[in-house]
């Protein structure tokens, strides 16, 4: 519905219809925050497969980050001389059709996990052993019940997080927010920067191709991350991704300061940012799910997704205003966010150790 409203704004000649369409789409896409919980759901995913599954999700994320800008720029370039379906409205109509087909497949083939199904490895679902008695009992009259799984009506024991677990939670939420803040900021800033810089003078088509090219070239490395995730600790993946992205930000800042920014150097910085923070975002939900009881999966996934959405929304606003506020200030804030995360990371290094995979 949001895409249809967005695409109808051109024909209706009503600017605020674009805003209304984006708001409706935002409400709809906010429900996607629940998809990551399936990467750490103990009922279907073991501890040693959660980072791998989250890496698969990031591969799809990278594919969308590449295909979306390229398709948008290509449709703008083609144009279509039509007041309803043209270079501005065609992405909205096409996405509305794609989502319609998607939901048909969901209705036909998707099966959700029963709510009453408990995770077999949930420590909160294990009942304490009962003391034995010397009094004889009639086994035929006793009800048959699995001794390790309590009735669904039994209240779960209260779990209290330790100080270390609180620290890990804050660290993972911070990196989830920072990664999506920087990715969203760069995606919204590059078209504005390219159009404002005389050396580039990008059209929407050229800006879309630039963003897509950076995403496509990171794709093989995201596949490698998927393969190595089973044999690498989450904290090492986080350290590599955040360090790569941080280095790219420092190089970009030095290029802006020296006024030596060109197409090649800008591309390498965008590539480093896209790869680094996409890789860093793979371990946030998996690390947190390994630190806390399986019964907390919904809470941990929501905490990470709220952080992702906070970063994505504020990052897009910050990136769009980057040229107006000054590119040095724009990059400086991103470096500061990563720096704060690095301090948390170093203090919690030993507490971030989890099972691989």
Q: Can you name each region flagged by the protein language model?
A:
Residues 49-76, 307-315:
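Glycine-rich segments within core transmembrane alpha-helices of 12-TM secondary carriers
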Residues 72-73, 96-120, 345-348:
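C-terminal membrane-cytosol helix-exit motif in multi-pass small-molecule transporters
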Residues 233-283:
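C-terminal transmembrane helical hairpin of 12-TM major facilitator-type secondary transporters
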Residues 76, 220-236, 323:
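Helix-to-loop junctions at the C-terminal end of transmembrane segments
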Residues 167-209:
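Extracytoplasmic gate region of multi-pass secondary transporters
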Residues 2, 15-32, 262-279:
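Hydrophobic core of transmembrane alpha-helices in multi-pass small-molecule transporters
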Residues 21-60:
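Cytoplasmic helix-loop-helix junction between adjacent transmembrane helices
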Residues 291-326:
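A late C-terminal transmembrane helix in Major Facilitator Superfamily
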């Amino acid at each position: 519905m949001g895409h249809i409203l967005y695409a109808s704004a051109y024909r209706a000649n009503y600017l605020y219809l674009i805003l209304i369409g984006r708001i409706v789409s935002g409400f709809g896409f906010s429900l996607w925050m629940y998809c990551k919980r399936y990467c750490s759901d103990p009922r279907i995913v073991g501890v040693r497969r959660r980072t791998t599954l989250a890496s698969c999700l990031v591969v799809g994320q990278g594919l969308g980050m590449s295909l979306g800008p390229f398709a948008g720029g290509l449709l703008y370039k083609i144009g279509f001389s039509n007041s309803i379906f043209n270079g501005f409205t065609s992405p909205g109509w096409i996405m509305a059709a794609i989502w319609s087909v998607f939901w048909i497949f969901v209705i036909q083939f998707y099966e959700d996990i029963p709510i009453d199904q408990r995770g077999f490895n949930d420590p909160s679902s294990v009942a304490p052993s009962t003391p034995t008695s010397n009094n004889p009992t009639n086994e035929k009259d006793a009800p048959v019940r699995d001794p390790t799984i309590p009735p669904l009506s039994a209240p779960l024991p209260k779990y209290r997080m330790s100080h270390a677990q609180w620290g890990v939670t804050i660290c993972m939420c911070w990196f989830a927010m920072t990664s999506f803040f920087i990715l969203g900021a760069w995606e919204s800033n590059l078209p504005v920067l390219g159009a404002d810089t005389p050396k580039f003078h990008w059209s929407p088509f050229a800006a879309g191709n630039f963003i897509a090219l950076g995403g496509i070239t990171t794709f093989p490395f995201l596949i490698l991350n998927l393969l190595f995730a089973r044999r690498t600790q989450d904290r090492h993946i986080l350290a590599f991704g955040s360090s790569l992205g941080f280095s790219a930000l420092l190089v970009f800042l030095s290029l802006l300061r020296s006024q030596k920014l060109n197409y090649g150097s800008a591309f390498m910085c965008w590539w480093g940012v896209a790869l680094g923070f996409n890789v860093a975002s793979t371990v946030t939900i998996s690390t947190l799910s390994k630190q806390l009881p399986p019964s907390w999966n919904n809470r941990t996934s929501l905490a990470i997704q709220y952080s992702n959405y906070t970063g994505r929304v504020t990052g897009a606003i910050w990136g769009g205003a980057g040229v107006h506020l000054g590119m040095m200030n724009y990059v400086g804030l991103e470096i500061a966010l990563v720096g704060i995360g690095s301090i948390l990371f170093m203090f919690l290094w030993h507490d971030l150790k989890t099972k691989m995979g």
